[in-house]
Amino acid sequence: MGNAGQAKFYLQQAAKINPENEQITLALGKAHFATGDFQNSLNCFLTLQKKTFDDIDINYHIAMSYGRLNQQGESHYYFGLYFKNEKKKESALFHFRKALDYFPKGSVRAVAISDAIHELSADKPKKPDKKSDGQQNISR
């Protein structure tokens, strides 16, 4: 296993030379996380999200960083986004529901969470339809 502190040093140098390089920023965020510098880790990952970095794992890294910073509401929210992108509805719903406990009702974040819950819940009725189709086929 490599030395995360040394990697962080070299990645910081590379980031100074090429601050727009998303791969460097991602690697630097991971190095910050590995060395326990969770705030700078979070800052790197949020920068990538704002640049619409095309990596669904970014929500996972953001969630982990918020968790290490003991910001449970944000952590659950980003885990919800991660699992939603992974098409794991039950895990996404679990985290979104947990996140709601940390935000005031009517706040921008609470509304976004509620919208995500409703969107995921709206997909649920598709399962019973498949079962009823299967039952009709069995009885034939």
Question: What are the residue ranges of the model-derived segments?
Answer:
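Canonical tetratricopeptide repeat
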Residues: A27-L28, H61, Y78, H95, ...
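Terminal, low-structured helical/coil segments at or just beyond the last alpha-helical repeat
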Residues: N85-R140
